[in-house]
Amino acid sequence: GMASEGLGMDVLRRTLAGYACHPNFAGVLVVGLGCEGNQISSWLDASGLQEGQLLQTFNIQDSGGTRHTVEKGIALVNAMLPQANQVQREPCSAAHITIGLQCGGSDGYSGISANPALGAAVDLLVAHGGTAILSETPEVYGAEHLLTRRAVKREVGEKLVQRIRWWEEYTRINGGEMNNNPSPGNKAGGLTTILEKSLGAVAKGGTTNLRAVYEYAEPVTEHGFVLMDTPGYDPVSATGQVAGGANIICFTTGRGSAYGCAPSPSIKLATNSALWKRQEEDMDINCGEIVDGSASVEQMGQLIFDMVLAVASGEPSKSERHGYGQNEFVPWQLGAVM
């Protein structure tokens, strides 16, 4: 930012650092303007990062403008390719998988089909040593007690409550209300209150202990089920999860979100069969089979877990096939921007 500091700058730098360290990137090129407040050199120092063959930086002003910048950028990326291309696939444990849990365009079926099915998949992942990140704090509001009672220790539960209180104050000073979250699409899909929405949303987290609560874009170091404080807006929320280390996004939708993510593939889970028939090209799994009576939550959870393993092994998700996600880097903008 040109004139941004404090919390907003801290969050931006943390987010950029998380992407720079992300395992789904073979190499990273960081390009700055040259006179911005978030200087590349100070960002590197603050983040504990060092330039190397697979982390290159430069700025536009020192490079002589747009054309020279593009030419230099292409040359630097090409120089990374030989080392990046040496990487070979090899068998590894599911413990290396970190899923970012998302829901967007929720409906009245979300809490009884796709969300609990995703929760069942989360339980399987956690049993294999993996990690799942629940986020979208405003959509936990009113159901936080279901999470605090699962906290591994008192401090974890208290940190979640502190983040809820922060959101109450944050929305108040900005003229909003925490209890008025459902969107027009949510209401058209049968959700009328934040409590209905939140009770369904927390089902994505399965049944295991809540092991840690993180602030936005903080590195997730704890294995198991954790929570990261983010807004409910999907691109901002997922950006924080990816910065924290999520290498796959599992996204439930009842109304038909076509969201995609990069560098972490997004697996789309339809809550109802009508949506599946309408947008099959965007959806990866039809959790509406639970509502139809042709599959159980546990069976669908196993199917989701199997797809997570397949996508982690290189099978492209529907949103990847469409090329979605290249424009979905949206850090949370906090504080004054002058």
Predicted regions and their residues:
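Metallocofactor- and cofactor-centric catalytic cores in central/energy metabolism, strongly enriched
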Residues: G1-I248, T252, S257-M338
